[in-house]
Amino acid sequence: MELKMNLQLFAQKKGTGSSKNGRDSISKRLGVKRHGGQQVNAGNIIVRQRGTKFHPGENVGIGKDDTLFAKADGVVTFEQVGKKKKRVCVYPEPAMAE
């Protein structure tokens, strides 16, 4: 009579499991960089955005990633156009008369 034994050994300690959490993407630093009433120089970034939450107005350009920037020196103003649309303009400061 032959006796076959099937022996299976288990681990003495449970291995440490890996978590599926613990990752996060880096922030994109979006938002308004220069607020209404602030002085800007040509080329300064006014708003970093995804899509056109704010539309470019007078003396404001738009980059390929929808970033709004000043085309001229002046003061930033945020304007409401209609019910939904917001526009950013840069108006040059009037020269002081002496």
From Swiss-Prot:
Keywords: Ribonucleoprotein, Ribosomal protein. The keyword Nucleotide-binding does not apply. Residues 1-10 form a propeptide. InterPro entries: Ribosomal_bL27, Ribosomal_bL27_CS. One of its GO terms (molecular function) is structural constituent of ribosome. The N-terminus is cleaved by ribosomal processing cysteine protease Prp. It comes from the Bacteria. GO terms for cellular component: cytosolic large ribosomal subunit. Residues 11-30 are annotated as: Disordered. One of its GO terms (biological process) is translation. PANTHER family: LARGE RIBOSOMAL SUBUNIT PROTEIN BL27M, RIBOSOMAL PROTEIN L27. HAMAP family: Ribosomal_bL27. Belongs to the bacterial ribosomal protein bL27 family. This is Large ribosomal subunit protein bL27. The gene is rpmA.
